[in-house]
């Protein structure tokens, strides 16, 4: 008991010396967190052995001491990694390396230079909310290399540049749904108006809205986005401009290039006309074959009816030498039998065609699509029956597949950004980074998670085989009844 108290007092003295010195070096900050780790381990050991007090200090529970020790270990590892980078020689204070600053938005990042940002909703000064923008943000990429980025603010929110990508860590629209009634807000930085009130229905930098001229010049647009928004006339002009740019000193193409281009155009036009004529001939042959099949079926049915009628009349004539009443009754019975037989034969002859029609109708109704309410209904995997590519896609739409990735939140965000730039078309959508919360508290459980949705299982398979997952990120497959 006395030995634990002496060690605890020694650790308290070390912490007081660090606080009084207030050295702005990473070595001092690492020593501070190492001392906090030793203190948490000592308190954990004391509580485990039934000690509830060390002098005037109340020993916390095992869970609290364990959480503080893990936090201190994580901070020591982060600071040691930062010390090896080019930013290790910069001044770092206790506030810059504190746990509260490290966990504030953007989470798990070192930050410096806080700036107050005030957002006024509905032009009401009393209805305002304060945010913190950081001048400098330090983050790690997938290769565990440290980068220093500048932070900025616009009408959409507060962001920091991650290469050419704007990573927003505060979105004003999220709080506008709670505080604003008209959907308008005004952004002020250091009590100076930066953005005047604008409606939140189509804010800049958001899907469907236009970016500001000042901010749009900083982020380059990709070639796919610019070409997809052009009209056919604009695309022709763009191709002509590209051709003129390719010419050197504005000269016209030589006669050889003209001839080659003309021959290529002629070949393309000929191939197109041939393909059109072939498709027309195929359609004509199909229509002729279908009409011939219908005629042959109709002739066979009429012949069978004539044979039945002739056979019935011969039997009635042979037996009609008796009384006229009996012959008339028998002929009526024979006619009834003949009609019934012909009907029976007609039904038997038309049964395969009706089954084919029902199959075609079911296939056509299935290939037309599924209703929105049926999307995500099936919880079973798609069967391997021969339904065609379109039918398989429609069956898979009933059970949308997903991939759940787990890892560090910053690593998951970098992975999402890289996938959007390199692997567009191999997935449907990405979710934001999220985590599970304990049922009896607010502490987060495990690592951060992110969902990736797909249109089909084949698309998920192609994505999984093509994309390289970052180090420390694992995945699992699943599906939902709806998204």
Swiss-Prot record:
Where in or outside the cell it occurs: the entry states: Host nucleus
Spell out the Low complexity composition-biased ranges. 311-329
In what ranges is there compositional bias, type Basic residues?
A: 245-258, 265-287, 330-346
Region forming the signal peptide:
none
Q: Where is this region: DNA-binding domain?
A: 399-483
- GO BP terms in the entry: DNA replication; DNA-templated transcription; regulation of DNA replication; viral DNA genome replication
Keyword presence, Signal? no
Q: Where is the composition biased (Polar residues)?
A: 211-230
Q: Which GO terms describe its molecular function?
A: DNA binding; DNA-binding transcription factor activity; nucleotide binding
Q: From what superkingdom does this record's organism come? A: Viruses
Q: How is it modified after translation?
A: Phosphorylated.
> Transactivation domain: where is this region?
1-201
* One Pfam family this sequence matches: PPV_E2_N
Q: Which family does it belong to?
A: Belongs to the papillomaviridae E2 protein family.
Subunit and interaction comment: Binds DNA as homodimer. Interacts with protein E1; this interaction greatly increases E1 DNA-binding activity. Interacts with protein L1; this interaction enhances E2-dependent replication and transcription activation. Interacts with protein L2; this interaction inhibits E2 transcriptional activity but not DNA replication function E2. Interacts with protein E7; this interaction inhibits E7 oncogenic activity. Interacts with host TAF1; this interaction modulates E2-dependent transcriptional regulation. Interacts with host BRD4; this interaction mediates E2 transcriptional activation function.
Q: What does this protein do?
A: Plays a role in the initiation of viral DNA replication. A dimer of E2 interacts with a dimer of E1 in order to improve specificity of E1 DNA binding activity. Once the complex recognizes and binds DNA at specific sites, the E2 dimer is removed from DNA. E2 also regulates viral transcription through binding to the E2RE response element (5'-ACCNNNNNNGGT-3') present in multiple copies in the regulatory regions of the viral genome. Activates or represses transcription depending on E2RE's position with regards to proximal promoter elements including the TATA-box.
Q: What is this protein called?
A: Regulatory protein E2
Protein's organism: Human papillomavirus 14
